[in-house]
UniProtKB/Swiss-Prot annotation:
Subcellular location as annotated: Cell inner membrane
Domain of life: Bacteria
Name of the gene: ftsL
Main location: membrane
Annotated organism of origin: Vibrio cholerae serotype O1 (strain ATCC 39315 / El Tor Inaba N16961)
Protein name: Cell division protein FtsL
Topological region Cytoplasmic: 1-22
Length: 106
């Protein structure tokens, strides 16, 4: 009489899962894949929210810089300042009234 080897437990469990336990195995795989999908979507949502917050902060910074540039432009274009720079740096002066020429456009 041939001697029987002891049954392999892992082989029996795998065979049982593939024959009798197909539906529970399929449900287990679906549950794990759904859980991984939730983790994946949560991660990407958090990344998108972080990127949106950074974009808003950059927008605030650029808006402040824009306001400062408008103020600087207004200060630099002030008439009295331009007149003072023309006299001092460029040595310009207002022409005499007899040297002014008026041009009429038709």
């Amino acid at each position: 009489m041939p001697r029987q080897s002891p049954p392999n437990l892992a082989k029996l469990i795998a065979l049982d899962l593939l024959t009798v336990g197909r539906v529970p195995l399929l449900l287990l795989v679906l549950i794990f894949s759904c859980a991984m999908g939730v983790v994946f979507m949560t991660h990407h949502t958090r990344q998108a929210i972080s990127a949106k917050d950074q974009a808003f902060m950059e927008r605030e910074r650029l808006d402040n810089e824009w306001r400062n540039l408008i103020l600087e432009e207004t200060a630099l274009a002030e008439h009295s300042r331009v007149q003072q720079l023309a006299r001092k740096d460029l040595e310009m002066k207002r022409p005499d009234s007899d040297k002014e020429v008026v041009i009429n456009l038709k």
